[in-house]
Amino acid sequence: MRRIASLLPALCLLSACSSKPVSPPLPPAPQSNASSLPQKTYVPWQGAQASGALTGDFANNPNAQRFIERMANEHGFDRRQLQGLFAQTERLDWVIRLMDQQAATYPGSYGPNGAWLRYRKKFITPDNVQNGVAFWNQYDADLQRASRTYGVPEEIIVGIIGVETRWGRVMGKTRIIDALATLAFDYPRRADYFADELEQFLLLSRKENDNPLALRGSYAGAMGYGQFMPSSFAKYAVDFDGDGHIDLWNPRDAIGSVANYFKQQGWRTGDIVAVPASGQAPSLDVGFETQYSIAALSSAGLRPQGSLGNHANASLLRLDMGRNYQYWYGLPNFYVITRYNHSTHYAMAVWKLGEAVDQARHGYAAKGN
């Protein structure tokens, strides 16, 4: 579920879960030309030849040994097979360095400096918007079906996939098992989290008959068009094309899975995302987790520049426009977008990129918020 706000965009997709919740029944998938989709071969889960001892980069790693015991005792994996698998798994020191860089904190700036404008330019560009139009046109029927099934607008699904992977152009080239094993076994600060993700990764590989040594994604283990972490896969991924397998490198399954994610997070069908405000409120705390009554925001000097519907409360969002700040009323659907990545900039970019692609499809110039 890029992205890294608190850890990494898709990493903020959720905590680990050992079972998938029941999803609503899916309408029949329309017949399509299979040659238009990326091809993937499903093979029996093997991982590696059985081995009597753990060799390779994690040969003397007690965390790896404990993990093997955990998977054998809790999930019935064969110890010798896991030893053979991890003997072929590589420790990636550069992944640890990148994670440390993401965890570093830097002093904040004082006053507006254009932070939102710089962030927006990473995603909302003419070329990127046109690539989004091409993706939407190619998968229009799937996007419409996902919107009908889950109640999530097509532009939100398109915006997520665009921000996460440029509509499949940048899905990551790191072997997922290498990334997750490195962080689970040799990154103490987040070892428990990544051990849970590695557990879910091996479970989904076995369930979907995937070779865990073949799957590639981000340096933190995020997968496919929507950059789901394995725990997100377990909770939200769906077989949207009806072929009997869940494949997040397949854009159709990814579209349905992103839509299901938002539905499960509480997306309100037909509701507003956010509304710009006139005025300034420098004395108020800002962020998607704040909560104010509309009356309190009015008393602080803000006025909505559009309808707030029936909402009596809102978060107060602030975008750095360079010379000043632009304030927004953040509504529940905006908060839902931040569940994918805990960042005001991220959520606004997803929403505005999706809008820009939608407008470009219909021949309108993108709005400049």
Model-derived segments and spans:
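Sec-dependent signal peptide recognition
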Residues: R2-A10
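C-terminal motif of bacterial Sec signal peptides marking the signal peptidase cleavage site
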Residues: L13-A16
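Bacterial signal peptide processing site
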Residues: S18-P21
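N-terminal export signals and maturation junctions of secreted/periplasmic proteins
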Residues: L37-Q65, E69, R79-N137
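Sec-exported extracytoplasmic/periplasmic mature domains
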Residues: I68-R79, A87-W94, R148-G151, G162-R169, ...
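Acidic/His-rich structured neighborhood in mature extracellular/periplasmic domains
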Residues: G111-S257
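Flexible, glycine-rich surface segments
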Residues: E208-G322
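C-terminal functional modules
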Residues: A314, L319-N369
